[in-house]
């Protein structure tokens, strides 16, 4: 009887372990610095971000938490800005993903900034050589509207790939950026935006520790619509006038620790409308990222 009782107890422990509820676990931690800059714009370094990232998992659910701080940097007294470093913005971001099928994930994201809050619906689909992904979000502004129109109207925005193809180390997708204001717009202010791109990705080298990648973003066309008539002076990207190239590197320091970086440069060709004089501001864009990630 004692042996039978021990056997039944052992079977009970095994059964409980087999059907135990999933646990919330930390899957990764990391930090990232991103520097975004447009030539001849507000600051010498427009946006300098420090991000702290945490990844979690619970069964088929995955979560991401991000807290960030942004500064503007000026090396001299120019552009109506004082020399030095100024705190300008912050970010709190929460990501939730649910694996629906082997091919499809659905997600939600909240992103909060000083002047706006965003609420995203997301998807990520991949089957064979076909893929699709995207974000659609509502942007609720918190600003006063004293500086620009975008500070006082809400938006519905989207960035998505309706269709993409992949083969081996190469991937290409058709990308759409669409935005529409919600509520009352000022006369002659932009209230709708449409941009079409082709984006391509490739792994250039993959070794035991080092991986090198590249990404290209090529704008086909970009259009804006206005509330009422077009303003007397404005500009937009010319057809094929916005093209960005990234080079990235990821190095595996250990089984769990990776360090990575990437650099992007965007070439811009503006089309001037109306009586707009030659404008050389924001004629190029640069993006630099460096970070580390520890996976458990």
What are these regions (language model features)?
Residues 251, 265, 280-296:
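Outer-membrane beta-barrel "beta-signal"
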Residues 24, 60-65, 99-106, 128-136, ...:
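Repeated loop/turn-to-beta-strand initiation elements of outer-membrane beta-barrel proteins
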Residues 1-20:
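Gram-negative bacterial Sec-dependent N-terminal signal peptides
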Residues 19-80, 287, 293:
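Short glycine/proline- and aromatic-enriched beta-strand/turn motifs that initiate or cap beta-hairpins
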Residues 44-50, 86-92, 115-119, 151-159, ...:
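Residues that define the transmembrane beta-barrel architecture of outer-membrane proteins
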Residues 52-58, 94-98, 121-127, 158-167, ...:
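Residues on the lipid-exposed face of transmembrane beta-strands in outer-membrane beta-barrel proteins
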Residues 133-234:
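Detector for outer-membrane/organellar transmembrane beta-barrel domains
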Residues 28-37, 65-69, 106-112, 134-144, ...:
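Transmembrane beta-barrel strands of outer-membrane/channel proteins
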């Amino acid at each position: 009887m004692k042996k039978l009782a021990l056997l039944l107890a052992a079977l009970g422990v095994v059964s409980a372990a087999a059907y135990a509820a999933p646990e919330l676990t930390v899957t990764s931690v990391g930090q990232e610095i991103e520097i975004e800059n447009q030539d001849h714009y507000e600051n010498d370094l427009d946006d300098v971000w420090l991000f702290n990232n945490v990844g979690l998992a619970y069964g088929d659910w995955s979560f991401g938490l991000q807290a960030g701080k942004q500064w503007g940097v000026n090396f001299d007294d120019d552009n109506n800005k004082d020399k030095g470093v100024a705190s300008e913005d912050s970010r709190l971001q929460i990501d939730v993903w649910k694996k629906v099928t082997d091919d499809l994930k659905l997600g939600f994201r909240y992103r909060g900034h000083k002047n706006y809050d965003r609420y995203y619906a997301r998807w990520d689909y991949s089957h064979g050589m076909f893929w699709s992904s995207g974000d659609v979000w509502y942007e609720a502004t918190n600003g006063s509207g004293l500086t620009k129109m975008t500070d006082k109207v809400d938006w519905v925005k989207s960035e998505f790939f309706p269709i993409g193809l992949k083969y081996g180390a190469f991937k290409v997708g058709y990308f759409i950026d669409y935005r529409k204001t919600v509520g009352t717009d000022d006369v002659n202010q932009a209230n709708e935006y449409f941009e079409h791109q082709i984006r391509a990705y490739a792994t250039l080298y993959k070794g035991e520790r080092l991986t090198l990648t590249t990404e290209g973003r090529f704008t086909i066309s970009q259009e804006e619509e206005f509330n009422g008539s077009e303003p007397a002076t404005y500009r937009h990207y010319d057809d094929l006038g916005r093209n960005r190239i990234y080079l990235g590197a990821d190095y595996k320091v250990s089984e769990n620790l990776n360090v990575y970086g990437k650099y992007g440069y965007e070439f811009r060709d503006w089309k001037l409308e109306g009586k707009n004089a030659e404008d050389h501001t924001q004629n190029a864009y640069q993006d630099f990222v460096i970070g580390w990630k520890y996976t458990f």
